[in-house]
């Protein structure tokens, strides 16, 4: 891991530029994705079948995954995995149900009524990667908040495979997916955004994917809503001398194994801990099955910063605004209020980040690349709309006429003013 020195502002700028470099867009990819989107818009199902044969090497006779195939997955899944998914589902549901919020209504003055309605999005599409990147936990994290929000129809797409990963189909059934289609890549995102003869057009698309999927989501944004454009996974760990280097090293590697572009950042006020963590990382890498991914990730993108004190550690990490933030300090909860920017926080020596990935209930779809400065984890709020309503009586309009027309004339919008004036007592 590379060590950085300097002021917090200087270090945070270096880290941000490095992260942008890891997340930068590929213009060749964008050109390819634009072509795919246009083809799907023009040819619909025919284009989906052609791209499935080209990219996935699968000849599709049927795009829809039947209920029979889904139900058979329950016979094939490992029973311990099924139990774990059921328990994780319960935790995710109990957490996200607390995010439900109702509308409001008030009467600030005589004859004036104001309010806000909360309405679920009608139809949502969830993208689920296939192959070695098949993550049933992501199915739960994307679908359950939508279901709790009251989304009427949830469509899931996943790349076609000769044999589906049973846990993916089981997770979809447990979470409440209504229909599953075997289509992936940029072509799948295009199908969700514009609809085809078989796939219905959705109102919002969520879910992780490779650079082609992420680019497609970016290009269809505006036609549909999206959750976010996520960059490589990242973890920031604030640790002092009370931290266990074995735990810290394991947690840094838990993100490094995701992707060669993943980031792992340790900020500590203990040089001894920093040294011990580096030694422990090398030791743990020796037996890690995904060493081929984790080693280049940690060597190229891993960073250690020695801070002067606890205050400086939190100041720097707030500038970094990591996706995942672990606070490996005794009585970590006492430091919670010091955090201004983070996607999700993990408190104390025993709260490893994977607890949040799989089980605790808080969502694992999180803002990356310092976007936690202005955005949040996926939740129920992402699947609802807020609709305002207003009602004024004739007397209330007359009482407010002067202020409203004054503002309208000040902006040079005479028709706005007249729309109020025609309703006054003189008319």
Swiss-Prot record:
Broad enzyme group: oxidoreductase
Catalytic activity entry: L-histidinol + 2 NAD(+) + H2O = L-histidine + 2 NADH + 3 H(+)
Presence of the UniProt keyword DNA damage in the record: no
SUPFAM superfamilies found in the cross-reference section: ALDH-like
Record's cofactor remark: Binds 1 zinc ion per subunit.
Superkingdom classification of source: Bacteria
Entry-linked PROSITE patterns: HISOL_DEHYDROGENASE
Keyword Membrane listed: no
One Pfam entry name: Histidinol_dh
Positions contributing to Zn(2+) binding: 255, 258, 357, 416
Stored Gene3D superfamilies: 1.20.5.1300, Nitrogenase molybdenum iron protein domain
The EC number(s) this enzyme carries: 1.1.1.23
Cofactor(s) annotated in UniProt: Zn(2+)
Binding-site residues for substrate, renumbered to this chain: 233, 255, 258, 324, 357, 411, 416
Keywords from the UniProt entry: Amino-acid biosynthesis, Histidine biosynthesis, Metal-binding, NAD, Oxidoreductase, Zinc
CDD domains documented for this protein: Histidinol_dh (cd06572)
Ligand binding (NAD(+)): 127, 187, 210
GO MF annotations in UniProt: histidinol dehydrogenase activity; NAD binding; zinc ion binding
GO biological process: one example: L-histidine biosynthetic process
Function field: Catalyzes the sequential NAD-dependent oxidations of L-histidinol to L-histidinaldehyde and then to L-histidine.
Family indicated by similarity: Belongs to the histidinol dehydrogenase family.
Name used for this protein in its record: Histidinol dehydrogenase
Species this protein is from: Streptococcus mutans serotype c (strain ATCC 700610 / UA159)
